[in-house]
Amino acid sequence: MSGILELEAKSRTEFGTGAARALRREGRVPAIIYGAGKTPISISLKEKEITKYYRKPAFISQLINLTIDKKQYKVLPKAVELHPVTDIVRHVDFVFLEAKTQKMEVPIVYEGKERALGVKRGGYFNIIKRRVILLCDVNNIPRNVTIDVTNMPIGTSLKSSQVELPKGCSFITKKEFVLATIIGRRGVKTEIEGEQEVAEAIQ
């Protein structure tokens, strides 16, 4: 799980391009928090600190306790603007968290795809979904969904119903969908095709 990140921010009352430039000269980054029917709060963060955390894996799904003028708010990053050359964070949008669950887009890690049974037999691991949208307990937001695919043979599909999700998480849709397949390259028979040919030869 991603855990909770503790950050401190300052409220700000000056806006516009000039005010943003002045903040950046001071080593700070403008940001805003909104959502959950609350009045938006304009804030600033330490540039080096927020850039450091942004560069860590799965920052966009990171639950944050944000302290502003001695008040704490539970928030999630929503959008991050970067400098086009240096990739330093220039602006951050956060959303307030009030509900017990939150819809999150989470990356998928296909563990063992290079050594999957079907790949070893000449197949190609075809990724259909690189991210999935989950409904998560706000205290158990995962950095990713890890799926072991080492036992997948050629000609098979990995479906959502086969995936064990992290505790407190569920797919937002009950309709089954395919995340990945292993397809045979030209001249490589799938295991299903091979079994059919053996059966026909025996008859």
Swiss-Prot record:
Pfam families: Ribosomal_L25p, Ribosomal_TL5_C
Domain of life (superkingdom): Bacteria
InterPro entries documented for this protein: Rbsml_bL25/Gln-tRNA_synth_N (IPR020056), Ribosomal_bL25/Gln-tRNA_synth (IPR011035), Ribosomal_bL25_b-dom (IPR020057), Ribosomal_bL25_C (IPR037121), Ribosomal_bL25_long (IPR001021), Ribosomal_bL25_short (IPR020055), Ribosomal_L25_dom (IPR029751), Ribosomal_uL5_bac-type (IPR020930)
A GO cellular component annotation in the UniProt record: cytosolic large ribosomal subunit
GO BP term, pick one: translation
Keyword presence, rRNA-binding: yes
GO molecular function terms noted in the UniProt entry: 5S rRNA binding; structural constituent of ribosome
UniProt keyword terms in alphabetical order: Ribonucleoprotein, Ribosomal protein, RNA-binding, rRNA-binding
Family according to the record: Belongs to the bacterial ribosomal protein bL25 family. CTC subfamily.
Entries under NCBIfam families matching the protein: bL25_bact_ctc, PRK05618.1-2, PRK05943.1
Known function: This is one of the proteins that binds to the 5S RNA in the ribosome where it forms part of the central protuberance.
Oligomer status and interactors: Part of the 50S ribosomal subunit; part of the 5S rRNA/L5/L18/L25 subcomplex. Contacts the 5S rRNA. Binds to the 5S rRNA independently of L5 and L18.
Cited PANTHER family: RIBOSOMAL PROTEIN L25/GLN-TRNA SYNTHETASE, ANTI-CODON-BINDING DOMAIN-CONTAINING PROTEIN, RIBOSOMAL PROTEIN L25_GLN-TRNA SYNTHETASE, ANTI-CODON-BINDING DOMAIN-CONTAINING PROTEIN
Name of the protein in its database record: Large ribosomal subunit protein bL25
Native source species: Rickettsia prowazekii (strain Madrid E)
Gene that encodes it: rplY
